[in-house]
């Protein structure tokens, strides 16, 4: 045990160019995420940290481990938590949420309250975006003096991120982006300095694991709102188009798709119309 502990503190050898390409290909094949040569040090550090925990001394041995059947699948899931970016915040890119509020008011005026509203946060990370969507929907109810059912689905590939989203507990720093009135209405102190989303809002949000490469098999359909912000930047351009085409198919007629500004500038879909607002990159489905 002592020898292993001493070994775990020793630095791993740098990745060779061949090893980097092998890991780069595995990550892209399984998740679609592209790790550029400029981010080799990030990949090496992420792998190295996990390898030290396991006492694995070289990249080839660890590669065999994560590709070894069911046991490899479990280890791959643990590794993904290190490799996927989980930094996000509430109401990230405010203009998108301003658009959402306007859209929901118009949507309700058009279809009425009998139709349940379905919202989807793709790449929801630790939950800040789906809870932001839920807050906007809840506030729209209050503003319009109406009551209707709405539900928010958050999906992500990282199990640890989803666990955080389901826990719905956040540090005070996370709430800096939330208006004081909303923070008071939708969060309650935990007693340890952190804050938890109130049950009445949390019960509107459901989080599930989903690899965006498997959107063709996703059960979501007839969505009124889909947010896919700050996710597409990690994929090749052809893959971005493929993902967006799949998401467009999941929209209800009149539904809203919001993506990150600058993430896809040359994409068009025959069933969608761009939203005329230069602050956002969004589309509505015809019909």
Describe the role of every protein-language-model region.
Residues 2-120, 244:
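Conserved AdoMet
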Residues 266-287:
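Core SAM-dependent methyltransferase catalytic element
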């Amino acid at each position: 045990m002592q020898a292993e502990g001493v070994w775990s503190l020793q630095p791993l050898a740098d990745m060779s160019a061949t090893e980097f390409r092998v890991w780069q290909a595995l990550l892209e094949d399984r998740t679609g995420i592209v790790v550029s040569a400029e981010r080799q040090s990030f990949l090496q550090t992420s792998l190295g940290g996990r390898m030290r925990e396991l006492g694995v001394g070289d990249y080839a041995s660890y590669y065999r481990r994560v590709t070894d059947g069911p046991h490899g699948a479990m280890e791959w899931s643990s590794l993904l938590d290190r490799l996927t970016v989980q930094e996000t915040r509430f109401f990230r890119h405010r203009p998108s949420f301003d658009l959402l509020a306007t859209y929901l008011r118009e949507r309700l005026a058009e279809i009425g309250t009998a139709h349940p509203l379905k919202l989807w946060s793709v790449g929801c990370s630790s939950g800040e975006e789906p809870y932001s969507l839920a807050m906007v929907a809840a506030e729209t109810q209050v503003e319009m003096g109406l009551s209707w059912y709405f539900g928010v689905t958050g999906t992500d590939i990282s199990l640890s991120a989803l666990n955080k989203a389901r826990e719905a507990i956040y540090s005070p720093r996370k709430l800096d982006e939330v208006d004081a009135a909303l923070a008071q209405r939708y969060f309650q102190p935990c007693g340890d300095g952190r804050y938890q989303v109130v049950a009445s809002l949390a019960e509107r949000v459901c989080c599930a694991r989903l690899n965006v490469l498997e959107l063709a098999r996703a059960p979501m359909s007839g969505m009124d709102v889909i947010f896919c912000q700050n996710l597409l930047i990690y994929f090749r351009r052809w893959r971005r188009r493929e993902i967006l085409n799949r998401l467009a198919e999941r929209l209800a007629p009149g539904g809203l798709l919001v993506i990150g500004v600058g993430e896809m500038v040359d994409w068009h879909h025959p069933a969608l119309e761009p939203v005329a607002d230069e602050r956002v990159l969004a589309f509505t489905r015809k019909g």
